[in-house]
């Protein structure tokens, strides 16, 4: 029933609504279609579908808007709403939240009361003589379809229409007990697949759609389809449009004021829906309902292929795509496709440059939530989420969890096949797929399996050597986007991680490694060989020498490697292949990094600058060695005589003096 979808402002829109209602033709008990459009309604409603909810067709005005309307406009409003009720009444529609007597006691407190008065007035200002019971009688006697019992139209008394923060409501004061209606008996329908009890047939049909995959509601702007009008409305919240209701903060426009209010919560952070069990709050009611199922354990949607169950249909759909490989969300600029709409939105920020996550302490902005949370670790503060070990406070729980991982090496998940210990259940599950090969995405080269298509794609690059992420400044390519972001800091000079001694670092691991130089502690001990490390980074790197399977073997010398890329690099020592050639002097190199380093001898580029004296260097290692002349740091110590050196080359030269003594 596309009577008047949304809130109309002003006389032309209301007249348009009235004209539309005159053009309606009744084709059955479940739907009313516009004349001349027998197939599809304005918002994608097919002819065999049930009617939409009352709030989808109601016309609303606030106090301020109502005061600006003239007498003729108010009369037109009255006529439109009366006709809306007639149509809904005709099909036996009922609404929740019918009893709102207590909300109409105080006229100043509740804006709905005055709507009763304006609805009951006649065109000349006197009380309207026609009652809704008379409307009901005429509808029941003349227009009630055969399949709808008369009790489906039992509106007998005062009807109150008005504005609410989220919905419009109807109150029905009948004064008599209705006869039981078999078509609309309470909880008369039970869905076989999810066991949900439903009151009305149209509710049953709506619940049926997610199970059948039927999506009759389509967005006219992007063509995306939905199983219910509510899902279409949620889609419009994200999409926005050219509607009359504009957000004052970002300028995004919406067709309905309720969608604008929902959108505004993304700016204000308002979360009105709070879980009574864990106090977690949500900005949208549907998100709150989805969360509640975590506590109840309800998982009505089960995957037919692997029997995994999910609490909501959207999670079930996302999971199904891991089996089918479907990627329905495509980037309009570069054509890259994604299985989840959220991944597409994050990807689009690469093109738009949007960075919605801003650090309040230093002003730095990020396009990824994960990058933002990692950044927040460097700021010590009094945030509400405390580290259980050192008491450091963080603004986000994710940041606190990441930080806690730097203290503890607890790994409760043990693989029974290889004995490897893992700290997270998700990591353990992914690791087991490598043994069983049961994941939905299986590598044809090594047989490893993965549950995530993105992780699988990253793994494939270890075989193919593909490096799709290229630095725009120097042309260096990387296998992962995180490696590219880390590299880009070498050009920008950005070093957000600052030590108390004044030294700054571009990445978290380098910062944590440096922090250990202030302490002689070596808290990270290898359980296999007993070797201890002061840095968690070096400990992890060492652990891989024990745990990593070396499945890539050189056919010439038999040496094995844990990664295909390592094997390919090693093979060049046998073949003398040097695929990376300088365009200016034709000198060739094994590694692309060696080529880049060499090219700087032609360009004279020196991107690495000493912070103490401003001297520039072509290599980062040269810059680090030079900086030690300022700091006095000497990390290379001779075990024979105890003498320490600031550079590895000086240390190696010194070691030869001991070899001469031995010879």
Curated annotation (Swiss-Prot):
<keyword id="KW-0862">Zinc</keyword>
<feature type="zinc finger region" description="C2H2-type 12">
    <location>
        <begin position="497"/>
        <end position="518"/>
    </location>
</feature>
<feature type="zinc finger region" description="C2H2-type 9">
    <location>
        <begin position="413"/>
        <end position="435"/>
    </location>
</feature>
<feature type="zinc finger region" description="C2H2-type 5">
    <location>
        <begin position="301"/>
        <end position="323"/>
    </location>
</feature>
<dbReference type="GO" id="GO:0006357">
    <property type="term" value="P:regulation of transcription by RNA polymerase II"/>
</dbReference>
<feature type="zinc finger region" description="C2H2-type 14">
    <location>
        <begin position="552"/>
        <end position="574"/>
    </location>
</feature>
<comment type="similarity">
    <text>Belongs to the krueppel C2H2-type zinc-finger protein family.</text>
</comment>
<feature type="zinc finger region" description="C2H2-type 16">
    <location>
        <begin position="608"/>
        <end position="630"/>
    </location>
</feature>
<keyword id="KW-0804">Transcription</keyword>
<feature type="zinc finger region" description="C2H2-type 8">
    <location>
        <begin position="385"/>
        <end position="407"/>
    </location>
</feature>
<dbReference type="Pfam" id="PF00096">
    <property type="entry name" value="zf-C2H2"/>
</dbReference>
<dbReference type="Pfam" id="PF01352">
    <property type="entry name" value="KRAB"/>
</dbReference>
<keyword id="KW-0238">DNA-binding</keyword>
<dbReference type="GO" id="GO:0000977">
    <property type="term" value="F:RNA polymerase II transcription regulatory region sequence-specific DNA binding"/>
</dbReference>
<keyword id="KW-0539">Nucleus</keyword>
<comment type="function">
    <text>May be involved in transcriptional regulation.</text>
</comment>
<feature type="zinc finger region" description="C2H2-type 7">
    <location>
        <begin position="357"/>
        <end position="379"/>
    </location>
</feature>
<dbReference type="InterPro" id="IPR036236">
    <property type="entry name" value="Znf_C2H2_sf"/>
</dbReference>
<keyword id="KW-0805">Transcription regulation</keyword>
<keyword id="KW-0677">Repeat</keyword>
<feature type="zinc finger region" description="C2H2-type 3">
    <location>
        <begin position="245"/>
        <end position="267"/>
    </location>
</feature>
<dbReference type="InterPro" id="IPR036051">
    <property type="entry name" value="KRAB_dom_sf"/>
</dbReference>
<keyword id="KW-0863">Zinc-finger</keyword>
<keyword id="KW-0479">Metal-binding</keyword>
<protein>
    <recommendedName>
        <fullName>Zinc finger protein 44</fullName>
    </recommendedName>
</protein>
<feature type="zinc finger region" description="C2H2-type 4">
    <location>
        <begin position="273"/>
        <end position="295"/>
    </location>
</feature>
<dbReference type="GO" id="GO:0000981">
    <property type="term" value="F:DNA-binding transcription factor activity, RNA polymerase II-specific"/>
</dbReference>
<feature type="zinc finger region" description="C2H2-type 11">
    <location>
        <begin position="469"/>
        <end position="491"/>
    </location>
</feature>
<feature type="zinc finger region" description="C2H2-type 2; degenerate">
    <location>
        <begin position="217"/>
        <end position="239"/>
    </location>
</feature>
<feature type="domain" description="KRAB">
    <location>
        <begin position="52"/>
        <end position="138"/>
    </location>
</feature>
<dbReference type="InterPro" id="IPR001909">
    <property type="entry name" value="KRAB"/>
</dbReference>
<feature type="zinc finger region" description="C2H2-type 17">
    <location>
        <begin position="636"/>
        <end position="658"/>
    </location>
</feature>
<feature type="zinc finger region" description="C2H2-type 6">
    <location>
        <begin position="329"/>
        <end position="351"/>
    </location>
</feature>
<feature type="zinc finger region" description="C2H2-type 15">
    <location>
        <begin position="580"/>
        <end position="602"/>
    </location>
</feature>
<dbReference type="GO" id="GO:0005634">
    <property type="term" value="C:nucleus"/>
</dbReference>
<feature type="zinc finger region" description="C2H2-type 13">
    <location>
        <begin position="524"/>
        <end position="546"/>
    </location>
</feature>
<dbReference type="GO" id="GO:0008270">
    <property type="term" value="F:zinc ion binding"/>
</dbReference>
<dbReference type="InterPro" id="IPR050826">
    <property type="entry name" value="Krueppel_C2H2_ZnFinger"/>
</dbReference>
<dbReference type="InterPro" id="IPR013087">
    <property type="entry name" value="Znf_C2H2_type"/>
</dbReference>
<feature type="zinc finger region" description="C2H2-type 1; atypical">
    <location>
        <begin position="189"/>
        <end position="211"/>
    </location>
</feature>
<feature type="zinc finger region" description="C2H2-type 10">
    <location>
        <begin position="441"/>
        <end position="463"/>
    </location>
</feature>
């Amino acid at each position: 029933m596309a009577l008047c979808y949304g809130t109309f402002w002003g006389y032309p829109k209301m007249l348009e609504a009235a004209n539309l209602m005159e053009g309606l033709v009744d084709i059955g008990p479940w739907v009313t279609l516009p004349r001349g459009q027998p197939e599809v309604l304005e918002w994608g409603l097919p002819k065999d579908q049930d009617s939409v909810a009352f709030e989808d067709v109601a016309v609303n005005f606030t106090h301020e808007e109502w005061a600006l309307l003239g007498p003729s406009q108010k009369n037109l409003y009255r006529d439109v709403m009366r006709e809306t009720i007639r149509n809904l009444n005709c099909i036996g529609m009922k609404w929740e939240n019918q009893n709102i007597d207590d909300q109409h006691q105080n006229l100043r407190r509740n804006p709905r009361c005055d709507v009763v008065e304006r609805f009951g007035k006649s065109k000349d200002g006197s009380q309207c003589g026609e009652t809704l019971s008379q409307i009901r009688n005429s509808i029941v006697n003349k227009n009630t379809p055969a399949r709808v019992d008369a009790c489906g139209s039992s509106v007998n008394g005062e009807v109150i229409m008005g504005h609410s923060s989220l919905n419009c409501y109807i109150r029905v004061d009948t004064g008599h007990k209705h006869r039981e209606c078999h078509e609309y008996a309470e909880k008369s329908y039970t869905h076989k697949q999810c066991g949900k009890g439903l009151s009305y047939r149209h509710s049953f049909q709506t619940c049926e759609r997610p199970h059948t995959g039927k999506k009759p509601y389509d967005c006219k702007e992007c063509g995306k389809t939905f199983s219910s009008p509510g899902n279409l409305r949620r889609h419009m919240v994200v999409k926005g449009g050219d509607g009359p209701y504009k957000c004052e903060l970002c300028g995004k426009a919406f067709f309905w004021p309720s969608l604008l209010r929902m959108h505004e919560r993304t700016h204000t952070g308002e979360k009105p829906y709070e879980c009574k069990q864990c106090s977690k709050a949500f900005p949208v009611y549907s998100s709150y309902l989805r969360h509640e199922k975590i506590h109840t354990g309800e998982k009505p949607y089960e995957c037919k292929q692997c029997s995994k169950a999910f609490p909501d249909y959207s999670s079930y759909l996302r999971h199904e795509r891991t089996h089918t490989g479907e990627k329905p969300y495509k980037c309009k600029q570069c054509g890259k496709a994604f299985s989840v709409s959220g991944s597409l939105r994050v990807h689009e920020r690469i093109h738009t440059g949007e960075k919605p996550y801003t650090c309040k302490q230093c002003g730095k902005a990020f396009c990824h939530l994960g990058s933002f949370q990692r950044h927040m670790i460097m700021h010590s503060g009094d945030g509400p989420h405390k580290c259980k070990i050192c008491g450091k406070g963080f603004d986000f729980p994710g940041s606190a969890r990441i930080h806690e991982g730097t203290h503890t090496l607890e790994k409760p998940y043990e693989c029974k096949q290889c004995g490897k210990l893992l700290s997270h259940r998700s990591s353990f599950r992914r690791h087991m797929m490598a043994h069983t090969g049961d994941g939905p995405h299986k590598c044809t080269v090594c047989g490893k399996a993965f549950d995530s298509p993105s992780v699988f794609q990253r793994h494939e690059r270890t075989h193919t050597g593909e490096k799709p992420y290229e630095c725009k400044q120097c042309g260096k390519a990387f296998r992962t986007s995180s490696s590219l972001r880390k590299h880009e800091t070498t050009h920008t000079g950005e070093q957000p991680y600052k030590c108390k001694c004044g030294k700054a670092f571009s990445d978290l691991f380098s910062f944590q490694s440096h922090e250990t130089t202030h302490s002689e502690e070596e808290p990270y001990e290898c359980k296999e060989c007993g070797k201890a490390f002061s840095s968690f980074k070096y400990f992890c790197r060492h652990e891989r020498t024990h745990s990593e399977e070396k499945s890539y073997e050189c056919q010439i010398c038999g040496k094995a490697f844990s990664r295909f890329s390592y094997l390919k690099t090693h093979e060049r020592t046998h073949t003398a292949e040097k695929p990376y050639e300088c365009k200016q002097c034709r000198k060739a190199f094994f590694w692309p990094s060696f080529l880049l380093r060499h090219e700087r001898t032609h360009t004279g580029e020196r991107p690495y600058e000493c912070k103490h004296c401003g001297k520039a260097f072509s290599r980062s290692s040269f810059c680090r060695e030079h900086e030690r002349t300022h700091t006095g740091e000497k990390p290379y110590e001779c075990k024979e005589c105890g003498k320490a050196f600031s550079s590895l080359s000086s240390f190696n030269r010194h070691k030869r003096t001991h070899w001469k003594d031995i010879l």
